[in-house]
Amino acid sequence: MKALARFAVLSGSVALTFFTMAGPEPLSVNESKNEAKPEEPRLWQGFYIGINAGYAFDLDTDVSDLDFLNAGPPVRTFSFDSDGPVAGGQVGFNLQPLSWLVLGIEGDVGYLGVHGRARQPGSPPAGTFAEINPGVYATARGRIGWAHDNWLLYATGGWFGSDYERRIDDTTICSCGTVLGKGSNDDFESGYTVGGGLEWLFRDHWSLRIEYLYFNLENSTVNVPVFQSGTFRFGFDDDGHIVRGGLNFKF
């Protein structure tokens, strides 16, 4: 009986040794690390579309009164600020080559609900008034961002354009009498924009963002006909700031 027990123990030891040797080879340290760290998902990569709304503030308008068309450098300059709501929509594409790096392009179209009007300081009550009426605006921008989990901190910049109406109502009193002049310029003006934002991916395909943009438009001129052959010229230089929130859906 004891011999049978010894045989059983010996047989079990041999079998255990055999299966241990025949099992899978242990992973090296490097292989263990690689298997323990799966590749992080590219949460931000792909196309997206969304809406936005916010506020435009400190839209600074510098008006240069150049007097007659060929009078040379500006003789009087004044400024005024405007503000108002903005709303629109955006579409874009993100590429995420690294887990922490996001590169993208974005375009958006919106409306600037801003109106500004001011009288030239020092002019009589019925003197010179400058007015701006922005409307539809658009941007085409690049984006570069730092991603951490479902958060994205990014910088952005590119082209900015807006339908910008500028008006001058001028009443000049001189030795020849009272001269009334009106002029306007309603063009789609181009410039540049820079800014940044923070975006939060709160569900699989949905994200919320807060974004700031500074924009600067090229200078524009309004000619005001006076007398029969004379013209007053007024130069406009406009820039401003936009803060807006947005909601995006990523495909």
Task: Place the predicted regions along the sequence by residue.
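Gram-negative outer-membrane beta-barrel domains
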Residues: K2-F251
